[in-house]
Every structure is written in structure tokens, then in C-alpha cells.
């Protein structure tokens, strides 16, 4: 990718803190930052589109006398398969009760039974510890917090803009370049503190559980700003996506299996007892691979999930939204088995950060799914993600408050257009490459083919695109490439990464890809980007 000749000065807006993203981690951060800070939130979405909004199952927290922190920690470490940071796990788990109480205070209408918060159980959990809002927990939490954030006078929403590049010298950040999705106008937003809370990269897969999933843009931007990327090969595939004719209709929450749902293959055989002593409640990577194996063995596109034995009234009471969704597609969850198959659901790795979101770049923070703070390791325990979002958002706010500075107004001259090898169908190509070669089951040959396909995409005849459009293409390409590089570097199978040519575990190590500072807004250096990525 190289710069065009035409340059133009673009407008600039100045903030104390810039937040990229609008999910649960971002909202928690905003509610904990002091009102003295001028905060800008760059959001490409409407309120109902962040991944947090689509979370069905719930939020895990020790909130019962039958449970304790050590049990939750042990379950998390077991699911993480040797790659969790135990200190991070302990910190986040031990704040679970406080998190739940804080959310209640914010007006989150958790489902109750006999006056007490109803706790369900999900895969990998040894106790009932998942609080929920019916079967649409994310929506319930997000609506409550959105109402609170809307009252903050110091928060300026920059809607229908997509961040395309960080302003960084490889040591510190000074702002964000973003493109208007309405008219393509490019704007510099300057700030000494930038918080990335933009989600993961499951939108780069052909089948994903969130219809508006992020595509790794923030991960790519952070990497090009110099941030270290960790464990990006660990993409979690949710075992039970409700699919009709090859299209994902909805996630079927793990809580369905937690409340007694059973899995059957097309031969009407329960198969999970043959894969795990935990049966349907095994960790997600185990269940996803088991379903994949059954689909391969029988040549089918799905298996069956059945909870009809619990009775119509029970299912309608516990899963009203799922009953409505499945009923609308002629397959009522309360009365029939439903077809399910795995789909990309969560990015367990991400930008290397601590629990407060601090990265190796001064002023750059990463919180929520976009970050790798060490909680999830090689595989996320069900319903730990919403807990992580709140804990990281709160801790990040404290760190930002302690270190916040003042921004200098930036005047940049950008190329109006950039020469790029990418084309309008790039996303479809990337989704096919990752699904086929970095999916549920991987191989040395498949990963090699995937990397070759990526190289071929870079060798296509160059076109000239507007600056923002070219950078959006570069971001999704870089994110997909980083997944393949990370997966190829891990010569073992662990958690969400299964390579049939390296089926056993090796020594537990974190995969790290150091950041390669490359800025397309600066003159003269752009042509080196492809070579730097290939050498990463």
C-alpha cells in the first residue's frame, strides 16, 4: 500500500480521552471517569449492535453460599488450559459480587426467583453462578447503562465514524484518525489517552454468532501503532448456533444445556458422553470439536439440541426470546429439537494488556474482548466475558484518571487516496480463508495454504482508494493475517486452537507478535508495510 500524490489538510477535534467502541467495557469506563475530563466516543454502530448487547447467557459471579471464589478460579483456570494469568483471574473473579451489586444499582433487571437473583449454570462451571436477564442478558445490561451514560454532559458521541488508524510514534499515542461512514470525510481526533474497547475479530469468520461482530480493526490499528498482540490463534467457537440453510439465525445460549438440554447426532444418539465426563457441560472448545466431529462423521451440517423433556412451560419461562426466535423459523425450542452447529463467537487473545487495560504503548489502553489480560487463556469460560468488561472498565478508569494529560491540537496533511492491492470483495475472501484454514480444526497444510492465499491477495493489481476506505481494508487484512501467523506459530493443540498435525500439548507459552509501527498518515514510509507484516 502506497500513498497517492494529492494531499489535503483535515479538520481536528481535541479531547482528554478518546474511547473507540461502545460496548459494556466502554460504558463501564465512561461511568467511572471523572466529569472534569472531556471524553470523545468514536462509534460506528447504533446502540443495539455491540457484541455486549447480543450476549444471551449471563454474567458469572460468586453470589451464592454454595459457591466460593476458589471454585470459580479453578473452573476458569481449567477452561483456560494452562495459559491464564492466575493473578488476573483471581482479581477479576474476586470482584464478581461487587460487580453484580453495582449493576443492580445501575438498574439492571436481573431475573429473580422467589425474590432472589436466579443463578443458572453453564458449561465448565462447577456451580450455579450465572446471573441473567431472561435469555437476553446483554440487552438488559446495556439498556440500563446506556440510560446512565446518556446523562453524562462531558461525553461527546461521535457516531457513524470508524476509527481507521492510531496516531503513534511507536512509543506513545496522540490520537485517532477516523472516517465518516456517511460521506467518507476523514477527521483527526487528538487525545493523550486512547482506550480501545471495540471488540474482537469473529466478524472475520464466515459463520459468527453476532451479526455485527467486529472484524479486528482495533487489533490491527494497535499492532501498527507498536502494541504487542498475544494469543490471537485462540478464537472461541460457540458450539450451538441456530442455523437454517447455512445462515446463522441466533446463538443458542449455553444456559439451555445448563438447564438440561441434550445434544444428539443425526443417528439420534447422544454423543457428548463419549467425548467428556462433563458431557454437554464440557468447556466450549471440547463441545465445539465434538459437534464438528459428529458433523464430519455423518456428513451433515448440524446436530440436534433438545430440551423438550423439560416441558413447554419451563422452556418458555427460562428462554422466552429463544422460543420466539426459533418459533418464527418453524422450529420451536420448547416443542422440537433445533439444528445447531459451531460458529465463531469470541476472541480469547488480543492486544496485550493488564487488568487496567495498560498496553506497552504509553497512553494506549485496551479493555474487554479486544484485550488479552490473561483471564481467558486458551479458552474462555462461559459468561466470564461480561464480568471482565466491567472489572477492566472500572480499573481502566482509575488508571486513566491518575495519568490523564492534555492533548495538543494536531495538524496533519493526509493523502486523499492510497494505492492498495485490496478490492471490494476482500472481506468475503478473508472470511472464507479463516473459516477453511484457521477454523475449529486446523492443520499445518491448511495454515500454510491460508498464508499463501493472504500473500496472493497482496499481489493483486493495485487500485487507488480514498484514504479511509483503503485503511479499513488494510485493518481487516492485517487482523486476519495476524490470526494465521499466530496459529502457524503454535506447534501444539491447546484450548481453542486444535491442529491435527500437533494434537498433543507442548510447554505452555504465550504467542506474541510484537507491534510494527507503521503509519499511513506520515509521508514516505508506506511501501514498507507489506514486507514488515510478512516478517512479523
From Swiss-Prot:
Annotated InterPro entries: FAD-dep_OxRdtase_2_FAD-bd, FAD/NAD-bd_sf, Fum_R/Succ_DH_flav-like_C_sf, Fum_Rdtase/Succ_DH_flav-like_C, NadB, Succ_DH/fumarate_Rdtase_cat_sf
Keyword set, alphabetical order: Cytoplasm, FAD, Flavoprotein, Nucleotide-binding, Oxidoreductase, Plasmid, Pyridine nucleotide biosynthesis
Purpose: Catalyzes the oxidation of L-aspartate to iminoaspartate, the first step in the de novo biosynthesis of NAD(+).
Protein name, per record: L-aspartate oxidase 2
Metabolic or biological pathway, per its Swiss-Prot or TrEMBL entry: Cofactor biosynthesis; NAD(+) biosynthesis; iminoaspartate from L-aspartate (oxidase route): step 1/1
Entry similarity comment: Belongs to the FAD-dependent oxidoreductase 2 family. NadB subfamily.
Active-site residues annotated for this sequence: 284
Amino acid at each position: 500500500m502506497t500513498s497517492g500524490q494529492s494531499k489535503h489538510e483535515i479538520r481536528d477535534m481535541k479531547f482528554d480521552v478518546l474511547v473507540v467502541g461502545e460496548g459494556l467495557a466502554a460504558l463501564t469506563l465512561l461511568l467511572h471517569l471523572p466529569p472534569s475530563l472531556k471524553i470523545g466516543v468514536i462509534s460506528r454502530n447504533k446502540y443495539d449492535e455491540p457484541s455486549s448487547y447480543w450476549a444471551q447467557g449471563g454474567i458469572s459471579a460468586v453470589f451464592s453460599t454454595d459457591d466460593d471464589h476458589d471454585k470459580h478460579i479453578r473452573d476458569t483456570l481449567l477452561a483456560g488450559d494452562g495459559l491464564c494469568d492466575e493473578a488476573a483471574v483471581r482479581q477479576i473473579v474476586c470482584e464478581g459480587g461487587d460487580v453484580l451489586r453495582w449493576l443492580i444499582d445501575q438498574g439492571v433487571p436481573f431475573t429473580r426467583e422467589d425474590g432472589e437473583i436466579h443463578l443458572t449454570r453453564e458449561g465448565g462451571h462447577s456451580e450455579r453462578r450465572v446471573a441473567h436477564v431472561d435469555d437476553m442478558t446483554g440487552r438488559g445490561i446495556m439498556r440500563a447503562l446506556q440510560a446512565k451514560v446518556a446523562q453524562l454532559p462531558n461525553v461527546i458521541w461521535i457516531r457513524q465514524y470508524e476509527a481507521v488508524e492510531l496516531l503513534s510514534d511507536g512509543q506513545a499515542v496522540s490520537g485517532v484518525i477516523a472516517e465518516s461512514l456517511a460521506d467518507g470525510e476523514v477527521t483527526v481526533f487528538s487525545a493523550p489517552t486512547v482506550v480501545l474497547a471495540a471488540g474482537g475479530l469473529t466478524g472475520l469468520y464466515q459463520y459468527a454468532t453476532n451479526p455485527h461482530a467486529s472484524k479486528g480493526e482495533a487489533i490491527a490499528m494497535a499492532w501498527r501503532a507498536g502494541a504487542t498482540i498475544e494469543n490471537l490463534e485462540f478464537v472461541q467457537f460457540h458450539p450451538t448456533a441456530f442455523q437454517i440453510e447455512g445462515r446463522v439465525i441466533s446463538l443458542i445460549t449455553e444456559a439451555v444445556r445448563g438447564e438440561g438440554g441434550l445434544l444428539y447426532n443425526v443417528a439420534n444418539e447422544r454423543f457428548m458422553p463419549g467425548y467428556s465426563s462433563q458431557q454437554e457441560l464440557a468447556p466450549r472448545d471440547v463441545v465445539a470439536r465434538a459437534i464438528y466431529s459428529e458433523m464430519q462423521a455423518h456428513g451433515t451440517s448440524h446436530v440436534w439440541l433438545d430440551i423438550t423433556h423439560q416441558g413447554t412451560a419451563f422452556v418458555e419461562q427460562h428462554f422466552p426470546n429463544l422460543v420466539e426466535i426459533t418459533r418464527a423459523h418453524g422450529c420451536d425450542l420448547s416443542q422440537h429439537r433445533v439444528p445447531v452447529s459451531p460458529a465463531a463467537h469470541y476472541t480469547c487473545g488480543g492486544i496485550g494488556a493488564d487488568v487496567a487495560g495498560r498496553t506497552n504503548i504509553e497512553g494506549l489502553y485496551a479493555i474487554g474482548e479486544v484485550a488479552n489480560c490473561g483471564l481467558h487463556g486458551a479458552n474462555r469460560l462461559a459468561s466470564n466475558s461480561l464480568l471482565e468488561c466491567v472489572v477492566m472498565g472500572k480499573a481502566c478508569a482509575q488508571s486513566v484518571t491518575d495519568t490523564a494529560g492534555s492533548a495538543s491540537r494536531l495538524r496533519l496533511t493526509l493523502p486523499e487516496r492510497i494505492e492498495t492491492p485490496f478490492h471490494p470483495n476482500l472481506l468475503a475472501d478473508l472470511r472464507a480463508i479463516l473459516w477453511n484454514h484457521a477454523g475449529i480444526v486446523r492443520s499445518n497444510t491448511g495454515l500454510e495454504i491460508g498464508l499463501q492465499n493472504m500473500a496472493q491477495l497482496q499481489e493483486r493489481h493495485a487500485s487507488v482508494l480514498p484514504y479511509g476506505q483503503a485503511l479499513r481494508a488494510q485493518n481487516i487484512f492485517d487482523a486476519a493475517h495476524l490470526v494465521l501467523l499466530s496459529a502457524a506459530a503454535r506447534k501444539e493443540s491447546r484450548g481453542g486452537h486444535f491442529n491435527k498435525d500437533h494434537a498433543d500439548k507442548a510447554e505452555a507459552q504465550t504467542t506474541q507478535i510484537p507491534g510494527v509501527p507503521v503509519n499511513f498518515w506520515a509521508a514516505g514510509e508506506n511501501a514498507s508495510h507489506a514486507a514488515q507484516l510478512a516478517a512479523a
